[in-house]
Design a protein with these regions (language model features):
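A detector of single, family-specific signature residues
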Residues: 1-361
Length: 364
């Protein structure tokens, strides 16, 4: 009965092997994350007498190569939520945290939870690619929001409220009409220096070039906004700044669109795709996000397990004669999954479907 605790970090891990009653089989030692070192570690653990179980914390992407190599070598591997390790056996007033201490702590956890450890199973390539793609999508969306806010701030000096002139939906390639417009008409004087008719003709050609619908009323609205704009004088520097910001925003927006399309393509290969997409409030954007965060739903033993994974189960708050009425959610699980669920519920609440069972039960 060999309990292997592995404290994983970037590029290396600390390994400790223990047996019941505090017997130390192998003192904590360091292993680099190279193919040869991980292979040697697997062989060393397989050579131990008795059954061997390996436990390591889920640490982003760092633990995945280690878990895969050890599992592929035929060892029992369990990947545990770091919260469980953090809350385990904190019976000392000293708060010592080193890689060696953590490895020993994980090994003791392995011994204590021996019969309840869940075996690690590598994700299939499609689910892994979907989750990685979603992570990059999140990063790109955050950068796009930052660049968009920066551009709007710069427009306050050259063409105030130009971003509010258009309400066209985003194209499939990520392009937005107001961003394309600002790329060519970066200053209010680019419009106001012309007559209304001259601008209308120029705007018509611009719409035809970029594939947008032209209306004379919209042309007159843009012209009136430009004439009444209070902006700084035109300068080559202002033009450079605006056009470079537009180019950056377009590039990131195209990346966001590409990630979204790839996520949809990958999610269509999963068996639960049709079921998820039939859910009200879930579309081609939120559906793949939901599937990416939940992963293989078959790994959950019950719906309560899935609720706990999302961190939305109620948190009891009772003590003695005091009964807590405000039992908020635990928020221990995936924050990204909770955000996705929040967006889905926002869609449901905004559209208010009359035949939704949620509203039928509430009304009853």
């Amino acid at each position: 009965m060999n309990a292997v605790g592995i404290d994983v970090s970037k590029g290396k891990s600390m390994v400790c092997v223990m047996r019941p009653f505090g017997e130390v089989v192998l003192e904590p030692f360091e292993v680099l994350h190279t193919a040869q070192n991980l292979h040697d570690l697997a062989e060393k653990l397989k050579a131990l007498d008795g059954e061997t179980r390996v436990v390591l914390e889920a640490t982003g992407n760092y633990h995945k190569p280690v878990a895969f190599v050890l599992h592929d070598a035929g060892l029992f591997v369990s990947v545990v939520n770091p919260v469980l390790i953090h809350d385990y056996d904190n019976n000392s007033l000293r708060r010592v945290k080193t890689d060696k201490k953590d490895a020993v702590k994980i090994a003791n956890y392995t011994l204590d939870k021996w019969t309840r450890l869940r075996q690690y199973l590598p994700e299939d390539d499609t689910r892994l690619a979907l989750k990685n793609c979603y992570r990059q999508y999140q990063q790109a969306v955050a950068i796009r929001t930052m660049l968009k806010n920066n551009l709007i701030s710069s427009l306050d000096l050259t063409f105030p409220d130009a971003n509010k002139l258009f309400s066209s939906p985003v194209k499939n390639n990520g392009c937005e009409k107001w961003v394309d417009f600002i790329g060519d008409f970066w200053h209010s004087e680019c419009v106001s220096s012309l007559s209304a008719n001259a601008f209308a003709k120029k705007y018509l050609k611009w719409c035809q070039k970029h594939g947008y619908v032209f209306t004379r009323s919209k042309s007159d609205e843009i012209y009136a906004c430009a004439v009444n704009s209070a902006s700084l004088p035109k300068s080559p520097t202002s033009k450079l700044l605006i056009q470079q910001q537009v180019a950056q925003l377009k590039a990131v927006s195209q990346s966001v669109a590409a990630f979204r399309q790839e996520m949809l393509r990958l999610s269509q290969q999963l068996p639960e795709f049709d079921t998820v997409m039939e859910m009200y409030g879930v579309g081609p954007s939120l559906g793949p996000q939901l599937m990416a965060e939940i992963g293989d739903v078959r790994r959950f033993s019950s719906k309560k397990s899935l609720i706990a994974f999302a961190g939305i189960e109620p948190q009891p708050n009772d003590s003695g004669k005091v009964v807590g009425n405000d039992k908020g959610i635990s928020k221990v699980g995936s924050a990204v999954l909770r955000r996705t669920l929040f967006l889905i519920m926002t869609v449901i609440l905004q559209t208010q479907p009359q035949d939704c069972l949620l509203y039928t039960s509430d009304a009853a």
